[in-house]
UniProtKB/Swiss-Prot annotation:
Name assigned to this protein: Serpin B10
Keywords assigned: Cytoplasm, Disulfide bond, Nucleus, Protease inhibitor, Serine protease inhibitor
GO CC term, one of those recorded: extracellular space
Family, similarity comment: Belongs to the serpin family. Ov-serpin subfamily.
């Protein structure tokens, strides 16, 4: 399961860099865990080159922490076999169960589904495996005659699954009579901070978008003993904010330089992120924390992004091989739509009632000011499994 979490986190960083290429100076927010899960449901039925490409993009066939020459790496990827694949699905079953454990301190809901043209019969083995490993099953629908109604039905289903926060996942004209298979996924999270911000301490402050431009934001403030970590290259400082019960954390990476975000994004790798955010690197400080309140909602049609990352065959009617899913010769993935929403406020993410427990560690610790008044990266992490659930870049609240 550890190697699967590593794969998901590596995929998160690779996807973030790819999305950043076409979103310079813009906010980014997505759930890498949700996208990985839903793509793996499709990977369950992929064969041949289609499966190999998907495994590569999802980082399944990468030796964790092992470096080798390009030729050896290429050979090893070709040898990625069925037993590895079955282990991945079994690990996903365990990981999903662990992450989605019922918890009174936060709400985490995921919505994953495949909608397939009803004239394409799915293999019983695929249906059984999908239910066993992912607790889901494909929905047979009539794209040929009722494509727009199906689009509306899918949107309604996702909206229900995410407490009304994810609306209109599939835009107008995104589904038509030629659609054969659509993968949809969304993740909803509502959590309360271990230490909540006092509303009366929130004031209007400038957020510096760059050296010449700033905008007024509602800046929250607290003074607490919190965990800080320092990054030497490029110069940045990180902070960990626990949610109640400490199962989940918000991790913030704040460049020292106002214009340092791009440099930090380019430098970040899974190995470095793991090192920076490890318990060994965390130090307890008396922190004067300034953090903007913000809402982010981002929608992505990931077809072109995932294709450019290396899994183009899955989207090709002539090349896609989903023979593990169905005997139909021209079954291919039409689109992968993803939408994620987050609200950071005094209580936590989303407006939530209740008071956070106060834990006061009565020891003398160094003090530091952490002023998130310029662009930064943030992650929401499931701590027990070390899995990144959400990745975000805040350039302008």
């Amino acid at each position: 399961m550890d190697s699967l979490a590593t794969s998901i986190n590596q995929f998160a960083l690779e996807l973030s860099k790819k999305l950043a290429e076409s979103a310079q100076g813009k906010n980014i927010f997505f759930s890498s865990w949700s996208i990985s899960t839903s793509l793996t449901i499709v990977y369950l039925g992929a064969k041949g080159t289609t499966a190999a490409q998907m495994a590569q993009v999802l980082q399944f066939n990468r030796d964790q922490g092992v470096k080798c020459d390009p030729e050896s790496e290429k050979k090893r990827k070709m040898e990625f076999n069925l037993s590895n694949s079955e282990e991945i699905h079994s690990d996903f079953q365990t990981l999903i169960s662990e992450i989605l454990k019922p918890n009174d301190d936060y709400l985490l809901k995921t919505a994953n589904a495949i909608y397939g043209e009803k004239t394409y019969a799915f293999h019983n083995k695929y249906l059984e495996d999908m239910k066993t490993y992912f607790g889901a099953e494909p929905q047979p629908v009539n794209f040929v005659e009722a494509s727009d109604q199906i689009r509306k039905d899918i949107n309604s289903w996702v909206e229900r699954q995410t407490e009304g926060k994810i609306q209109n996942l599939l835009p107008d004209d995104s589904v038509d009579s030629t659609t054969r298979m659509i993968l949809v996924n969304a993740l909803y999270f509502k959590g309360i901070w271990e230490h909540q911000f006092l509303v009366q301490n929130t004031t209007e402050k400038p957020f510096r978008i760059n050296e010449t431009t700033s905008k007024p934001v509602q800046m929250m403030f607290m003074k607490k003993k919190l965990h800080i970590f320092h990054i030497e290259k490029p110069k940045a400082v990180g902070l960990q904010l626990y949610y109640k019960s400490r199962d989940l954390s918000l991790l913030i990476l704040l460049p020292e330089d106002i214009n340092g975000l791009e440099q930090l994004e380019k430098a970040i790798t899974y190995e470095k992120l793991n090192e920076w955010t490890s318990a060994d690197m965390m130090e307890l400080y008396e922190v004067q924390l300034h953090l903007p309140k913000f809402k982010l909602e981002d929608s992505y049609d990931l077809k072109s992004t995932l294709s450019s990352m290396g899994m183009s065959d899955a989207f090709s009617q002539s090349k896609a091989d989903f023979s593990g899913m169905s005997s139909a010769r021209n079954l291919f993935l039409s689109n992968v739509f993803h939408k994620a929403f987050v609200e950071i406020n005094e209580q936590g993410t989303e407006a939530a009632a209740g008071s956070g427990s106060e834990i006061d560690i009565r020891i003398r610790v160094p003090s530091i000011e952490f002023n998130a008044n310029h662009p930064f990266l943030f992650f929401i992490r499931h701590n027990k499994t070390n899995t990144i659930l959400f990745y975000g870049r805040l350039c302008s609240p």
